[in-house]
Amino acid sequence: GVAHSFSRNGYKFESGPSLWSGLNSIGNNSPLGQILFLLKEDVEIKKYMGWKVLFPEAQFDLEVGDIPFRQKIRELRGDAALEEWDSFIKEIQPLSRIISRMPLLTTSPQNLNLLESFNLLTKLLPDIKHVGNLRKDFGEIAEKYLKDSFLNNWVDLLSFLISGMSMHDTNTAAMATLFNEWFNPN
């Protein structure tokens, strides 16, 4: 896959890439970022604002974030593909909100006390009906909304960049984390 690993002070770290904000903010959903924060370790973060994309349908430079990508969809594939993408994103947003509200390292689910459970439930309540989708393979959700080959290839690429696997073998929770950063690229 595309995971990164390194050793430091006797610890071994393995983490998939973060395509956008990743390690930069306190309270982020990057497991590596949270560990570094807990260990009070600072690492130099090099942000990039775009990347070159080589696809069967097109080759192009793309800035990070939702707006530049929406513009590129319209340019390359037209309004129908953009409508597909918007429907897909509308389905993914509640999953991304759920992921962004869940504590990754604070406690394990078995050890949540009553107050923590209540606080977590109130945060998740607006999107609770979507929680079951986090267990699905991401390809199942993507193919429900995306018929355009470019969009399917794009989501398959993003899945590979996160997990080293196809969208059908990638966990929806991992992709919801990526898309949470997609919605907030800075």
Regions found by a protein language model. Give the residues of each.
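Short, contiguous strand/loop micro-motifs
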Residues: 19, 125-126, 186
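Helical element adjacent to the flavin cofactor pocket in flavoenzyme catalytic cores
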Residues: 175-186
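Rossmann-like flavin
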Residues: 56-170
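Generic low-polarity alpha-helical segments
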Residues: 20, 43, 142, 172-175
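N-terminal glycine-rich phosphate/pyrophosphate-binding loop and immediately adjacent elements
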Residues: 1-101
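A short mid-domain helix/strand-loop element embedded in enzyme catalytic domains
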Residues: 28, 32, 169-175
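Fold-independent oxyanion-binding glycine-rich loops
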Residues: 16, 158, 171-176
